[in-house]
């Protein structure tokens, strides 16, 4: 699982606005903002959550750690 803080951090690493991520992930901006405002692991519909996670991973984000202990993100530059 991915935390709301990881989603925000990943977006910051990519220098994406919330609107950009919502468009790439094909979710509404309201949905994305709700997930980012959550404390810890957002309560999300699985389909939307997977879209957000996959959009970030496709852009080079790697989610590291686990949600309960030292969650983080890192950016892999594309070759």
State the predicted function of each range.
Residues 27-44:
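Recognition helix of helix-turn-helix/homeodomain-like DNA-binding domains
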Residues 1-12, 50:
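A short, Lys/Arg-rich alpha-helix, primarily the initiator
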Residues 61-79:
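Helix-turn-helix/homeodomain-like alpha-helical modules used for DNA recognition
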Residues 24, 45, 69:
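Residue-level "edge-of-site" marker
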Residues 10, 24, 35:
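Residues in the recognition helix of alpha-helical DNA-binding motifs
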